[in-house]
Curated annotation (Swiss-Prot):
Pathway: tRNA modification; N(7)-methylguanine-tRNA biosynthesis
WD repeat locations: 4-58, 95-135, 290-330
Protein name from the UniProt record: tRNA (guanine-N(7)-)-methyltransferase non-catalytic subunit trm82
GN (gene name): trm82
Organism: Aspergillus fumigatus (strain ATCC MYA-4609 / CBS 101355 / FGSC A1100 / Af293)
Main location: nucleus
Record's subunit section: Forms a heterodimer with the catalytic subunit trm8.
Length: 502
């Protein structure tokens, strides 16, 4: 029996349902699919997309592209995609995307927002009691989304894209268009002056026939056709590729209880901008400037919202007192004397209980580096400095993590396809079952640096045994490189020539 690799889990989210009687879930994206698992058992409940049904079609909203003169905004019906046969003989949908790089869940656990890669589509799902995902809308953005977050009590999506723009759009599609319909004037295309009466040679007749076909097509496109798009509002923009987006609300003062929202945006050109929240997002409060390479991840700790932790292509993190644009600390990510490039994949701020049944919390900052099997751990001190703790050693490159409701452990998704520490070299042979997720918790030590231990949980073992979808063990080098690049693309943000945009 041939053993294949399994698609690693690129994103994983814990979903705590607020509705009584609904089960808690893990949502995970791997390859072109989203999987739901029961949080109590790890049993796989559903896969999206399901096998296509020829009797159904989906209404798709398309926003106008920023390229070209004419908006492509329209609603169109998408025919069901052809079926393929997956392992075990089950029909499998052929999709227009190969990855789902972004998942965001509403605070009540009722909705999921996902970004599918190549088709630039932002999809909203209702998370049903059974764990199945019911797609409510799919909205094709002008450019590929690079970061999303939910605001205004989960009523609004903020979406940043690779063109540097940030849009605001409702979570539930209203069906309204924010773009004034444009009526294409009836223009009379230039008709060929020649006719079959004036052209006689075979070659010229063929040329005339081609011109007449082209004229006929132009006549059709010149007809009046109103455009239609979903509600979409441009609220701010960068002149460079936007890489991350964070939304926070902080108290205006100590007595009134009023909150003021801010939007933090980072880009490829080393900038971090602090803007006011909508409807004043055009007002720039300040910048946090100090990085010398791209910024890929921003993190504002919930327990200390006056601080911002940022990282990217530099070999250090930076802690900011963001409302003052003040650099508090540069935190090295490499040991002294090490000369290599690093890329920060993601930064998390977590508040964890130190042990089961413990009331003592540990506020930690965890950092994943692209192509590294170590999770770096820090504590944020009262003066805003980061203090290094013992790191977490996973069995493969760390891709993402989530925290179940008890806050005593973390569930980490790892790459079991490539060698630990490499983004290109594949393991000589796949394991069975493949390690998709691992769980870790803080050791109950009372003194010294924080330390971690792996937990042997039945839940993660069940998720691993369920698997995702197969990757053939017989792929050629070109196919492997395409899969590598789809999972590890942050390094492409690094400019090849310092001072010049490639």
């Amino acid at each position: 029996m041939v053993v294949n690799y399994q698609h690693p889990i690129q994103c994983i989210r814990y979903v705590e349902k607020q509705t009584a009687g609904f089960r808690n879930l893990f949502l995970a994206s791997a390859g072109s699919k989203i999987y739901t698992y029961a949080a109590e058992t790890g049993r796989k409940l559903a896969i999206w997309p399901e096998a296509p049904n020829a009797s159904h079609s989906t209404v798709v909203s398309v926003a106008p592209s920023s390229e070209g003169d004419e908006p492509s905004a329209k609603k169109r019906k998408v025919s069901p995609v052809p079926e393929q046969t997956a392992k075990g003989g089950q029909p499998e949908a052929s999709t227009a995307w190969s990855t789902i790089p972004i998942l965001t869940v509403s605070s009540d656990g009722n909705f999921l927002v996902a970004v599918t890669g190549e088709d630039k589509c932002l999809r909203v799902f209702e998370i049903e009691e059974s764990g199945h995902l019911k797609q409510l809308s799919e909205r094709h953005m002008p450019k590929r989304p690079s970061a999303i977050t939910l605001v205004d009590d989960d009523k609004t999506i903020l979406c940043g894209d690779k063109f540097g723009d940030v849009y605001s759009l409702p979570l539930i599609d209203t069906g309204k268009s924010s773009i004034a319909p444009k009526i294409h004037a009836k223009m009379k295309p230039n008709q060929p002056a020649a006719t079959t009466l004036t052209v006689h040679s075979k070659r010229n007749l063929a040329s005339l026939e081609q011109q007449l076909r082209h004229y006929s097509q132009n006549e059709k496109t010149a007809e009046e056709k109103p455009t239609s798009a979903f509600e979409l509002h441009l609220i701010l923009g960068h002149v460079s590729m936007l890489t991350d987006l964070v939304y926070v609300s902080v108290p205006v003062d100590a007595t009134s209880g009023r909150q003021r929202p801010y939007i933090f945006t980072a880009d490829r050109d080393e900038h971090i901008r602090v803007s006011r929240g909508p409807p004043q997002a055009h007002i720039i409060e300040n910048y946090c400037l100090g990085h010398t390479s791209f910024v890929s991840s921003l993190c504002v700790p919930q327990w200390a919202p006056e601080y911002l932790v940022s990282g990217g292509g530099d070999n250090h993190l930076i802690v900011w007192r963001w409302n003052e644009s003040r650099l508090v600390q540069k935190v090295p990510l490499l040991e002294e004397g090490t000369d290599s490039e690093v890329v920060v994949r993601r930064i998390w701020a977590l508040s964890l209980t130190k042990a089961a049944n413990s009331q003592e919390n540990a506020n930690v900052i965890l950092v994943a580096l692209d192509g590294s099997s170590k999770l770096l751990c820090f504590t944020l001190e009262s003066d805003g400095s980061l203090k290094a703790q013992n790191s977490i050693q996973a069995s493969g490159n760390v891709l993402d993590l989530t925290v179940p409701s008890e806050n005593s452990s973390i569930v980490v998704s790892v790459d079991a396809v490539r060698e630990a520490g490499s983004t290109q070299e594949w393991r000589t042979s796949p394991s069975s079952p493949s390690t998709l997720v691992e769980a870790f918790r803080l050791k109950p030590a009372s003194e010294g640096p924080l330390d971690w231990e792996r937990t042997s949980e039945a839940i993660t073992a069940q998720i691993n045994s369920e698997g995702t979808s197969d990757i053939s063990a017989d792929l050629d080098e070109k196919q492997k490189k395409e899969l590598n690049d789809s999972l590890y693309s942050l390094g492409n943000l690094r400019k090849k020539n310092m001072g010049e945009d490639d």
